[in-house]
């Protein structure tokens, strides 16, 4: 086996192969023959599926500087090492079905990366530096142990497909609603009890799958007329079991995002002072060409300054930004034309989040 491996690599070196297939070789270590002398300078794609690798060499980028695809599916790699950040031409990295516990921050240096697949590992978090991957189009981190996603993920301006199925997510950063290119979002099999208010506001986002999030009872009305999957959602549960603000209408109850501080009703004609102040500051912020210098560094807490950049959501009726209070209105899915797709048995509702009593009274999902 060793001699056959050496021969394969030697031929690739002599003939300046661009693709090298070392799948199913029972390799426990990265082949030294790949790293000898100047390495394989012409190699662009390396496939090493179903081996027993536990780590990657520190000089990988030095010996294989032109790699655009590295396929390491089904190995035993525990850590994505710092050296990975030096593969500046890498476009596709597949580390699915390994034993990954840590992804190093240096992964953010892979500025050419377009496809990152980390499914079926042991990851509990992603480094914020993932947000530096401006060319990233596909991110698959399904079947891990993630509790949340980094807020900076919304800086992945080219991201089109995000898959985080079968993790332990209990919330999704509202910042992800700002992803300008996101077309498909799949979060099935998590622990979500609510979704960001603005999810679905982007016209680019067309497919959202949240199946089997049993505590999830409300879908933002922006998702109406999108392709959605919500089977297994809205299971009966005592509201006291979930420590979140909830809103009820008739026999229906939905949980609201943790950032929501108050719920308005048709009787609340006057907005809270903090909400009025935040809306005024937000308008001034945009009127001053997004220059917050008119605010002194100590005039607002950091959390409120951050809210100015990324509001809680936008009114589903008039697009007015909202910061602390929302006026919700429920539309049971079973009473919409979409009921047939779910055999009319779902207890999930569409939720319109409005900014005032006027918008609350005039919003109509079906009009």
Swiss-Prot record:
The keyword Repeat applies. The keyword Nucleus does not apply. Coiled coil: none annotated. InterPro entries: Leu-rich_rpt, Leu-rich_rpt_typical-subtyp, LRR_dom_sf, LRR_domain-containing, LRR_R13L4/SHOC2-like. It comes from the Eukaryota. LRR repeats lie at residues 16-36, 42-63, 66-87, 89-110, 112-133, 135-156, 158-180, 181-202, 204-226. Keywords: Leucine-rich repeat, Repeat. One of its GO terms (cellular component) is cytoplasm. PANTHER family: LEUCINE-RICH REPEAT-CONTAINING PROTEIN 28, PTHR48051. This is Leucine-rich repeat-containing protein 28. It comes from Bos taurus (Bovine).
